[in-house]
Curated annotation (Swiss-Prot):
This is 2-succinyl-5-enolpyruvyl-6-hydroxy-3-cyclohexene-1-carboxylate synthase. SUPFAM superfamilies: Thiamin diphosphate-binding fold (THDP-binding) (SSF52518). Catalyzes the thiamine diphosphate-dependent decarboxylation of 2-oxoglutarate and the subsequent addition of the resulting succinic semialdehyde-thiamine pyrophosphate anion to isochorismate to yield 2-succinyl-5-enolpyruvyl-6-hydroxy-3-cyclohexene-1-carboxylate (SEPHCHC). Keywords: Magnesium, Manganese, Menaquinone biosynthesis, Metal-binding, Thiamine pyrophosphate, Transferase. Pathway: Quinol/quinone metabolism; 1,4-dihydroxy-2-naphthoate biosynthesis; 1,4-dihydroxy-2-naphthoate from chorismate: step 2/7; Quinol/quinone metabolism; menaquinone biosynthesis. The keyword Manganese applies. InterPro entries: MenaQ_synth_MenD, THDP-binding, Thiamin_PyroP_enz_TPP-bd_dom, TPP_enzyme_TPP-bd. It comes from Arthrobacter sp. (strain FB24).
């Protein structure tokens, strides 16, 4: 094979994006060279070109020797402007970064690792991608067949590593043409293959020495920097008003994770209250109710206006009152499901699955007289009572932080699992229009990889991005702050609610156990996981701007300040009184709701 200039017009990566493989073959091999004669570099170039032809525009790379052929081929494509590479030394962080890129772009994103434990570090991101239906393409480099099972260094069975968490996995033997395998993998990742939801796939690419390319004429460094903008949320939809022939019913619209603007449009068109989780991307508009989870009991079976039916969009994951409502045998519920989803198995849920809005409208009906007004009046009273209760707190609390971050978010907002997203769900007042695109890892709702996911979201969306998370979640992925000098800084503001431990357990049954005294110390140690980490020093070590605040006014000022790169706002709070605070909020909201509904 003769060496080729990656910027030569005949090179595949410099060709048009839609150029077929036969035009400007990137391998440099003769057309009749056969399927088992490719060098490692030739096979890697075929794989990369096929990925790009299939719509991959971002690849996250972790360094390694066995994966070097793919790294070199990707560097050539990067220099030609056909793909953007992002380098992360920690494979777990790389996996979640790729996940975030795929979330923000909606397109398949690849992550490249060398062999051995490097591949295993991708498992958490692959599991999340599976349950969240995210098109994540794992490119795992491997030893050739003759080295497997011999005790060769960094060699194990990689193909079965992810099990049922991948839509498709294939072993590509060394020296063979990977084009068909890559095409099939991309079809599976994007949901085209066998009519399944999108999700992760694995291409296990074996390479034989030599792993480096022949001398190239010239490989310039990529030029230009990304441009960033302050965006807004998804555009609202408009549906035709419900016809008068529809039956009147006391139906509520529940919008769970990833429901989308269609949930808001449906509620508005049919005169129904909208109970929307933050990551539904439908928590806006005139029908949205703020602290809805505290109001459900006031529309229960013994109330004057009990809920008769439920229409569900997306996946509900945040609150027990919602789960209890969906579990009620006396309240029929329907799930809008126009496409296959990854978060449940058919037949395992009680909701009636409907794939079109017309049938959904027949099920839901239109709001009964006074039904929507009752919810909106109760919601306004509840929001006022909640805001009043929070204003009486001398220092910032989780709900006040959630409300402020929600109010100030522009462009993209990611909410960490645990208390962060629940604080917003409780206290975040619905806006008239969508003001940001909301992301959250709700596939398996783990706290791992949150900073890395947000970094990928910021890179992919090319917008100002805010991340709200707790200190334990922050520390779990502190390595996600590490960026090399050659990587562009994303425009990412990280708000850390630091209460020196895991506050969510204070609000669960464990909080009551701790208050009882017998297991108090054990609960604090095992669930509270107290720490004394100096986040300012940690930020300095990674070269990230940091400021600390403790009051609502200080936080509002910090959120309003312009940002030019990555920054951390540390909100120092105390979780000791959190359980009692939530008790006061519930009591205040309950009193306000009862007063309004009593008329």
């Amino acid at each position: 094979m003769t060496s080729e200039n990656p910027l030569d017009p005949n090179n595949a990566y410099a060709a048009a994006d839609d150029a077929p493989l036969s035009e400007g073959d990137p391998t440099g091999a003769p057309a009749d060279s056969g399927s088992d004669t490719l060098t490692a570099i030739q096979a890697a170039r075929v794989a990369v070109k096929t990925l790009l032809d299939g719509g991959v525009r971002y690849v996250v790379v972790s360094p390694g020797s066995r994966s070097a052929p793919m790294a070199y081929a990707l560097a050539e494509a990067d220099a030609a402007g056909r793909v953007e590479l992002l380098v992360r030394i920690d494979e777990r962080s790389a996996g979640f970064t790729a996940l975030g890129l795929a979330l923000s772009t909606g397109a398949p994103v690849a992550v490249l690792t060398t062999s051995g434990t490097a591949v295993g570090n991708l498992l958490p991101a692959v599991m999340e991608a599976n349950h969240a239906a995210v098109p994540l393409v794992v490119l795992s480099a491997d030893r050739p067949d003759e080295l497997r099972g011999t005790g060769a260094n960094q060699t194990t069975d990689q193909l079965d590593l992810f099990g049922e968490h991948v839509r498709f996995a294939v072993d590509v033997p060394a020296g063979t043409n990977p084009q068909r395998a890559v095409e099939t993998a991309l079809s599976a990742a994007t949901g085209v293959f066998e009519d399944t939801p999108p999700g992760p796939v694995q291409l296990n690419l074996a390479f034989r020495d030599p792993l480096v390319p022949p001398p190239a004429d010239h490989l310039p460094e990529a030029t230009g920097r990304r441009t960033w903008q302050i965006g807004r949320g998804p555009e609202p939809l408009t549906l035709a008003p419900a016809p008068a022939t529809l039956a009147e019913r006391r139906t509520v619209v529940l919008a769970g994770h990833d429901a989308g603007p269609v949930a808001e449009a449906f509620a508005r068109a049919h005169g129904l209250p909208l109970l929307a989780e933050p990551s539904s991307n439908s928590r806006f508009g005139p029908n949205a109710v703020g602290p809805y989870r505290l109001l459900l009991e006031h529309f229960g079976p013994d109330s004057a206006q009990p809920i008769e039916r439920v229409v569900l969009f997306g996946r509900p994951t945040l609150s027990r009152p919602v789960s209890a409502l969906l579990a009620r045998a006396d309240v029929p519920s329907a799930l809008y499901q126009p496409l296959p989803v990854a978060w449940y198995e058919p037949g395992r849920r009680t909701e009636l699955p409907l794939d079109n809005l017309s049938d959904l409208a027949d099920f839901s009906g239109r709001g009964s007289s006074g039904w929507l007004d009752a919810w909106l009046l109760a919601g306004a009273a509840a929001q006022h009572a909640l805001d009043q209760a929070l204003s009486e707190e001398p220092a910032a609390t989780g709900p006040t932080v959630g409300a402020l971050v929600w109010k100030h978010a522009r462009g993209q907002l990611m909410l960490g699992s645990s208390n962060g997203i629940r604080d917003v769900d409780l206290a975040g007042q619905p806006a008239p229009e969508p003001h940001a695109t909301i992301f959250a890892n709700r596939g398996l709702a783990g706290i791992d990889g949150t900073i890395s996911t947000a970094t990928g979201i910021a890179w992919g969306g090319r917008q100002e991005t805010t991340l709200l998370l707790g200190d334990v979640t922050f520390l779990h992925d502190a390595g996600g702050l590490l960026l090399g000098f050659a990587e562009n800084d994303p425009l990412l503001r990280i708000v850390v609610l630091n209460d020196a431990g895991g506050a969510i357990f204070n609000l669960l049954e464990h909080g009551a156990v701790q208050e009882s005294g017998t297991y108090g110390n054990a609960v604090e140690r095992l669930f509270g996981t107290p720490h004394k980490v100096d986040i300012s020093s940690l930020a300095a070590a990674y070269g990230v701007e940091h400021c600390a605040v403790s009051t609502t006014a200080e936080l509002a000022k910090a959120l309003a300040a312009p940002s030019s790169g990555r920054s951390i706002i540390e909100v120092r709070t105390d979780r000791a009184g959190l359980r009692k605070l939530h008790g006061r909020i519930k009591a205040a909201v309950g009193e306000a709701a009862r007063s309004v509904l009593a008329g």
